[in-house]
A protein has these predicted regions:
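Mid-length scaffold segments of soluble, non-membrane domains
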Residues: 61-66
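Extended beta-strand/beta-hairpin segments
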Residues: 1-60, 71-80
């Protein structure tokens, strides 16, 4: 069975506020192949809209799995 991992990194800059409404939710996901994704909380929870949020990532991962399964079946059946 395959193993997968990722590193999630966040830091609080010196002198930055750490209040619920204002702390920076920006962080990075780093994968084994070196890919880095700029992430944040969802905008509804004070995140940055221009970054990927965990809710979007779950949807994208699920859609990717479904697509790849469909394509694998189509390829095995030699459908074009």
């Amino acid at each position: 069975m395959s193993e997968y991992g990722a590193t999630v990194a966040w830091h609080l800059p010196p002198q930055a506020s750490f209040d619920y409404e204002t702390f920076d939710r920006s962080h990075e996901w780093t994968f084994a192949g070196g890919e880095v994704v700029q992430a944040s909380g969802s905008p509804e929870y004070f995140g940055t809209a221009s970054r990927v949020n965990p809710d979007e990532a779950v949807i994208a991962a699920t859609a990717s799995c479904h697509m790849l399964t469909f394509l694998s079946i189509a390829a095995k059946k030699r459908l074009r």
